[in-house]
């Protein structure tokens, strides 16, 4: 065998004596070797990890930069991403309508606003419309400071907002007056106009203003946990109340629980601000402990009197509204697909009462009280969103709206307003905003604004919905997007994306990059709704978790087999992609069925399934994967854990490209580090490369600048093209009609 271009791989020390003993229900004590455990030490704390990272970065960069199509892809992506896009508008308490906006290649979306009375003016303006209110692009020189969330005060005078840097889950909360917007001429790296309030030590933005607008509640950790660059799990989450104008050190502790350091405590307020719902989460399951209080009669400074409404790990509660002593919830209490319920806090002994019963065939994903007495419910039904309007007083259905649209929706509205904005998008629909009047008898809204993508004729594309049988015969739904004239004869390259976990549904989502991939490579983009998601309700999720996790891999592999059998693909032209939990999927499938795939892309993947609970948020994922330290769970986890089941012998692995970040504080990069080291050791002279692209300036996924995403996508697509021998149609006019897979 000739020596491949990537031989030899960068050296890394391998400790053959490193091992951990686990307890197995089937086999008793089991000693598991872990020769790359040294790579668990974070980048900043280990010279060995640092040397490994720098060597892998250089190695991968050299290979990727030598791909001829890489620069062409980068330029093509830049040109295609340069279009105006915006989010669903939201009317706020200051009399303005706010929306996020990007003129094309800005690093982050900016926040703009227009007076409610002047909303329609943005439809006739050639630019973004309205005025700039806040621009995260002005907060940093490299574009990696991102807005993680915001909340307007009830009085409309103050705006609390969270800022994260370099994709970290850690963020800082600031406050500014709504009368003090950003100026377009502002110097980058500065944030003038904000108030002196600075709230640190928070992971994620969970902020609720008190009804008097004098301060807000928030969740935080002790100062020593504000690292953001290590693997240590955050501990001792607490709830505080901050008063405007005071230092954080003077904030009032609302709740702490030192006996349970890994529980996550958060506080929600009812829309009126009168009732507070305090919840504890111990894992990623949809179960919580819940307490409630009437803070309108409580003294925050001297302690809130809490009433326990649920003391078992059985359900989750989301407060959606209140009327006098009646509180409205969305909950999965005795309803795995969720329902809407009420609680009279003056007669709490009567318990929770059902207002809108559970739909056994659809998952309730959001509930809002709008237009005084309308209950707007969004369901996930058969891998698509549905919007239903009910009467708040009786719970009875009024009508389904936008039933002619297939895809996903996002909504905004207020209880004191008859208007609701609805944003619809899909695989070939970049985004259309409708204004819907809830006090009118109609099931359709009026067009408000639509995203346009110049240079890409969206009518040239089509999306099919098909079902195929999994290994156990279960029917699995799948979306297939392609150009209408792409032949279904097995010659087109196929790119399959999967996730399969945490009840996260894979819905029709617009991506100009994906459509470009389909156009330039005459390819098909495929999304199977495998078990572990929630496309068909909570039962679908449960069929792909814990001891049933293998169903997820079987569903995904079965998708590829069906595509080949039905002439959508052939065995030489299938690439797959997955990130985070989807990284378990891609690496497990590459281990179990390497012959099915030509190229594998894994982004920020969870891969060492015996060690995941020890780092970052991993302990919370045991509800999804199981606990490796539980003998019964160990047996089914160890059986598929990608890091521990790398094939050997004469197996030919697909080409593999791993994306990770040295400071990812959601999924530690150690998963990718260890797995890539093991793959390169096991297959030093394989015909296909195993590369790892490591970023030193980003986190998990959120907050990446546009430039970062463009560069990553150019690396990804050009790597797939080289690995599968694809021809860019933009460079070869005949390739669009005569594309064929070149086996190299």
Swiss-Prot record:
Q: Which GO terms describe its molecular function?
A: oligopeptidase activity; serine-type endopeptidase activity
Main enzyme class: hydrolase
Identify the Gene3D superfamilies for this entry: alpha/beta hydrolase, Prolyl oligopeptidase, N-terminal domain
Keywords for this entry?
Hydrolase, Protease, Serine protease, Virulence
| Biotechnological and industrial applications of this entry | Lentinulin A displays strong and selective activity against the plant-pathogenic nematode Meloidogyne incognita but shows no further phytotoxic, antibacterial, or antifungal activities.
Q: Which Pfam families match?
A: Peptidase_S9, Peptidase_S9_N
> Does this UniProt record's set of keywords contain Transcription regulation?
no
Source organism's superkingdom? Eukaryota
Disulfide pairs here are none
**One annotated GO biological process:** proteolysis
* Cellular compartments per GO CC: cytosol
InterPro entries on file: AB_hydrolase_fold, Pept_S9_AS, Pept_S9A_N, Peptidase_S9_cat, Peptidase_S9A, Prolyl_oligopep/macrocyclase
Quick check: keyword Hydrolase in the entry? yes
What does the function comment of this entry state? Prolyl oligopeptidase; part of the gene cluster that mediates the biosynthesis of lentinulin A, a highly methylated cyclic dodecapeptide with nematodicidal activity. Excises and catalyzes the macrocyclization of the methylated core peptide of ledMA to yield lentinulin A. LedP works in a two-step fashion with an initial cleavage at the N-terminus, followed by a second cleavage at the C-terminus of the core peptide.
Query: Family assignment?
Result: Belongs to the peptidase S9A family.
Binding partners and assembly: Monomer.
What is the official name of this protein in its record? Answer: Prolyl oligopeptidase ledP
Q: Give the species this sequence originates from.
A: Lentinula edodes (Shiitake mushroom)
